[in-house]
Amino acid sequence: MSSEFISKVDKEARRKAANILRDKFLNLVEQLKKGEPLVMEIPMRTLSNAIYDEKRKLLLLGEKKLRRNFLDLNEAKRFMQTVLMASIIYDALVSDEYPTIRDLYYRGKHSLLLKSIEGNKIVSEENTWDEQKESDSVIVDIEVFTSLLREEMLILSKEKGKVVGNLRIRSGNDVIDLSKTGHGAYAIEPTPDLIDFIDVDAEFVLVVEKDAVFQQLHRAGFWKQYKSILITSAGQPDRATRRFVRRLNEELKLPVYILTDADPYGWYIFSVFRIGSISLSYESERLATPDAKFLGVSMGDIFGNSRKKPYLSEAERKNYIIKAKDADIKRAEEIKNYEWFKTKAWQEEINTFLQRKAKLEIEAMASKGLKFLAFQYIPEKITNKDYIA
């Protein structure tokens, strides 16, 4: 690849990641020189090692570590896989390449032949890895071991989130105006830290779970009317979207509101944005947005409560409500026991759901009319601070 087309930001990111990766694994060489056994200490990525920091409102990785010993027959293969993958990633960095996680799987996949002591007979044959989930897990191990996100190592993944609004950014060598995307939107790139924010004219960020609702709000001109940055995660958010939202909040000081379906899966999407996820707790400090607010759709929006009237009439509730399934009930009961859902407001929300056994999609609010959703429901809830923090 010709380096003349690579931006300075990109080159600096490569240099930094390559240096950290090299130095971390050179420590293994030093162990060998000293005659010490080859050992890697990697923080454990388990639920038991995920700790909720109440003060910082973040789900963080605990201090438990696993020791990966090359001389341990149970760990030798995983040790080999980790070193192999690190070598492939390092080569890609210094060669100005942009591998995907699928590329890395294929680049490292080959057979290892174990020969007899005499060297004239193959005793056994084993693949470096058989399935991509193996190599993906190794990449995560390297992230935890080096404290480098895969995005920082210029490893690409499929773009998922989209954004539109009065914001100009620099990506690579180009300046992109996110207010001039027509009926479309800017796809949030898998390396959001390489984006520079040039200027912004917005008062808040609205993240919408559903892509279809995002498109409706975009075409209705919601972000123009209310000077906002409109984003969709298109379901469960990917890492790039979470990091982009975090940067908008942290660097541009824009409040963040999350709009999801009124069900346990929508609540969890909100919590992933706000405090992080259990599986990626090692990344929460860079991906989560502790200041994010749950705008809705809430049980109070559907049924009302002592503080507010419902947005839906009895007839509308009858038409729009979806009966919760057993899986929904089970998920709600699980979420209810998570430390970060034990606030008074969230316990009330979850208990109402369990009592009513009812859920609602965002589209139901749009069924009352797009103007209702865009120009009454959302702005009214923001103005009245009708959200769960």
Swiss-Prot record:
Instruction: Tell me what controls its activity.
Output: Not inhibited by the DNA gyrase inhibitor novobiocin, instead inhibited by eukaryotic topoisomerase inhibitors such as m- and o-amsacrine, ellipticine, and the quinolone CP-115,953.
Q: Name one GO cellular component term.
A: DNA topoisomerase type II (double strand cut, ATP-hydrolyzing) complex
- What are the entry keywords? ATP-binding, DNA-binding, Isomerase, Magnesium, Metal-binding, Nucleotide-binding, Topoisomerase
Q: Which SUPFAM superfamilies match?
A: DNA topoisomerase IV, alpha subunit
Catalytic residue list: Y106 (o-(5'-phospho-dna)-tyrosine intermediate)
Q: Which domain of life is it from?
A: Archaea
The UniProt similarity line reads:
Belongs to the TOP6A family.
Q: What's the protein called, per UniProt?
A: Type 2 DNA topoisomerase 6 subunit A
Organism field: Saccharolobus shibatae (strain ATCC 51178 / DSM 5389 / JCM 8931 / NBRC 15437 / B12) (Sulfolobus shibatae)
